[in-house]
């Protein structure tokens, strides 16, 4: 029977009963207790991560992929031209799982060959990479790199794998082939509609990163009474193509690096996240949950993560200021 455009409640009853068996408002854990208060990993819905250049939004997306692979045994497809080609992305991931050891053999404290191969085998179980830089244009000659085309390619890849991806990272939005010569709002709307449609259709968790437009700087006083200028976080409407993102977004996160002067002011008021940050070369990021949808999946607000530069991973601290353990696979 063909699908109906208009349906009655009773015509949907059979599928509604099936959905009750697995119905959950919240998704799965992110791997960070503080983050779980505000967000969750719910399949069938996209997460959008915004931020200024260099703020660490790609790092957050990649860490979510690793945490969910460790905790939930997920399989991810990563599309990240901004990170690099397939080899650079793989080395980036290996570093994140290497627990601080160097991947280059010439360095002291480098991974052994067996450790290196064990990490690659674990990543093989959980990660696939679509290489825009040296793959797409050669394999799909003349095919625009749009979200619709991307998801159609992904569906064909799944047939070859004889399996399905749990999550897909697309990093960032501006790497798509967007026709911005005419109706820009319409073009962006069509791309986001495709993201939502295929995410729901295939029950993925998709993560789409996006840059934010620069805001006007604000003048404030530091702890010594000296003036400094700083840039506040962008609102969701101030992301690149923000009107469409704000309308179409489900879970929208903004990764923000607070200015050093602001961190000192907050530390002086007893904020333990900023104490930790200042003691670790200003490694804090505020994650602002600017929109949450569907109801129950999370809530608006903010939490803090800290970037461990040696391990190339985000961590959180507890209420006593103690560093919580980073998620690593058992190799």
Question: Could you say what each language-model-derived stretch is?
Answer:
Residues 2-100, 246:
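The Walker A/P-loop phosphate-binding site
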